[in-house]
Amino acid sequence: LGYITCPGSNLGTLR
């Protein structure tokens, strides 16, 4: 993790 996985989250660590 640590990258933008979802367009909704800027951090991308949550999802």
Swiss-Prot record:
Nucleotide-binding keyword on record: yes
Enzyme Commission (EC) number: 2.7.3.5
PROSITE patterns given in the database record: PHOSPHAGEN_KINASE
Single GO MF annotation: lombricine kinase activity
Keyword tags: ATP-binding, Kinase, Nucleotide-binding, Transferase
Catalytic activity annotation: L-lombricine + ATP = N-phospho-L-lombricine + ADP + H(+)
Family affiliation: Belongs to the ATP:guanido phosphotransferase family.
Subunit (UniProt): Homodimer.
Name of the protein described by the UniProt record: Lombricine kinase
Species in which this protein is naturally found: Lumbricus terrestris
Biological classification of the source: Eukaryota, Metazoa, Spiralia, Lophotrochozoa, Annelida
